[in-house]
Amino acid sequence: MAVAAATRIAVVVVVLALAVLAPAARGLRRDDFPPGFLFGAATSAYQIEGAYLDDNKGLNNWDVFTHTQAGRISDGRNGDVADDHYHRYTEDVDILHNLGVNSYRFSISWARILPRGRLGGVNSAGIAFYNRLINALLQKGIQPFVTLNHFDIPHELETRYGGWLGAAIREEFEYYSDVCFNAFGDRVRFWTTFNEPNLSTRHQYILGEFPPNHCSPPFGNCSSGDSRREPYAAAHNILLSHAAAVHNYKTNYQAKQGGSIGIVIAVKWYEPLTNSTEDVRAARRALAFEVDWFLDPIFFGDYPREMREILSSNLPKFTPEEKKLLQNNKVDFIGINHYTAIYAKDCIYSPCTLDTYEGNALVYAIGRRNGKIIGKPTALHGYFVVPEAMEKVVMYVNDRYRNTTIYITENGYSQHSDTSMEDLINDVERVNYMHDYLKYLSSAIRKGANVGGYFAWSIVDNFEWVYGYTVKFGLYQVDFDTQERIPRMSAKWYRDFLTSSSLTDGLQVRSRRADS
């Protein structure tokens, strides 16, 4: 153990030296971003908190899923302990403070606040934990940026209503959000209702990878589900839950608390596979099914034309009253989680295998064109390094949704957990990824995009859903046996970028041996 610890320390020392000596040719300054710009890091409750039964917390859907279907997780593990953030939050707040960020994005565990939903009573211990976390952040000058729902719901709501497939869950979410606004809103200036509902519903109800694991052919062979209908029924209930929460916040809390509220959407950029009209339209159609699916109803009161034409009766319809609720309660900002880009091939006029989640859009997504890959692969399947896509995504959302303020609420680089310790710590690829994506973000801002902040995913390695602990996104390496947090080269680079007025650059050097 002593030898291993000494090796880790030696690696960290070399990492810091490499970061200090890195060349600064292309240049990126914090001053390239507007005054008041938020720079932070992000996490979510299930992925880092642990303490899955502590202090009267109820079981959530991921607790049950990872315990009953461990074979669906790459390493068979779960979030029972994860980063033990519930007990180590003060250490993690200190890490954030030392990093120099001015905001921290985290989510609240619904089952920690309302273990059985609105019928079971509020858990005072859950309220107390998030009060302690929020207060600790504010004492360090860090703004909480709070997500109400990041994939996890109380298990009882899954069994009682069928989760997001049941319309009754809308009232549950409105009640839960009200409890949070009332308990924490005097200190929270940034709220988001949902994280990536456009991604979670597809993994839940098209591919069947996330609980409740519903799907149908050609996407999979689940025991139940309808991949053509259920994702859109669930999304419909999420959108109306969102609208009810936003209406409540704007009516009863915003004026006296002074905060803002939005929603976070996962945005993958789609490039046409060829220059053909069909593939150009396919790329546009993929974006409609990716982005416009949730944002068009919020801004324009209805689903995009492409979805209505293709899905027909499988796409629910809003009543006039529901359209009014959506349009009269627009978000104050849009959160974008952006990581990658991919090619889009038309499947209306060309034969395709429609088994990716773009299949319902009659699009086939592929990472290669003419034998050349779109960007360097990362540890997540289908995720490539394509920095210029950041600018394209931001400009698309900015232009379509009327210059509404945008926050990049997630952006990060994944490594395989079986990478050598030296390369995990000397994460040159992550440094270059962050530098290059930030450069294209600053370019979008110069072109007029209204962007208010950037959050790196993630501050620490954590439980990465069906990948378990087999991939690592953290600026800090975590030893899950000891819970030791070890700064990576990317943490040093990010801190230098945030605290220095001088030019910083990506590291165009290769990792060196720790003992060289």
UniProtKB/Swiss-Prot annotation:
Transmembrane segments: none annotated. Its EC number is 3.2.1.21. PANTHER family: BETA-GLUCOSIDASE 16 (PTHR10353:SF159), GLYCOSYL HYDROLASE (PTHR10353). It comes from Oryza sativa subsp. japonica. This is Beta-glucosidase 16. Hydrolyzes glycosides and monolignol glucosides. Can hydrolyze para-nitrophenyl beta-D-glucopyranoside (pNPGlc) in vitro. Hydrolyzes para-nitrophenyl beta-D-fucopyranoside, para-nitrophenyl beta-D-galactopyranoside and para-nitrophenyl beta-D-xylopyranoside in vitro. Hydrolyzes the monolignol glucosides coniferin and syringin with high catalytic efficiencies. Keywords: Disulfide bond, Glycoprotein, Glycosidase, Hydrolase, Signal. Expressed in leaves, stems and endosperm. The keyword Nucleotidyltransferase does not apply.
